[in-house]
Amino acid sequence: MIIRIVRMHFTEAGVDESLEIFETNKVAIRNFSGCTHLQLLKDADDANCYTTLSHWTDAQSLENYRKSELFGKVWGRVKTLFSERTQAFSLEKFIEL
């Protein structure tokens, strides 16, 4: 399993539009082949900072999503709303208690 974390800082004016984009596309993203979990997290201290947390069955499933028309449509709109460069991480579970 791959855990994907993407931390995004939006312009103040871009927050509402980014939330609309997520709301419109969240079901399609969650139902994309290989996606088993999807969350949007809001930073506790920064109202313009959000993080997506998604689980993928394997790295190829995530890569297929990143090359998909859906990703191109969503990311193409969202990236214009950022106030700074995003931080993205792909992780594997190592130890779980």
Map each language-model feature to its residues.
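Short, well-ordered beta-strand segments in beta-rich or mixed alpha/beta enzyme
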Residues: 2-9, 39-66
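Short, surface-exposed ligand-recognition loops at beta-strand->loop->(often short) alpha-helix junctions
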Residues: 9-19
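An amphipathic, aromatic/His-enriched active-site/gating alpha helix that lines ligand/cofactor pockets
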Residues: 27-36, 55-89
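Residue-level marker of intrinsically disordered, low-complexity segments enriched
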Residues: 1-3, 13, 27, 72
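Glycine-rich beta-strand-turn "strand-cap" elements at beta-sheet edges
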Residues: 2, 39-46, 76-97
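Intrinsically disordered, low-complexity acidic/polar segments
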Residues: 15-17, 49, 61, 97
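Non-catalytic surface loops within mature trypsin-like serine protease
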Residues: 10-12, 58, 92-95
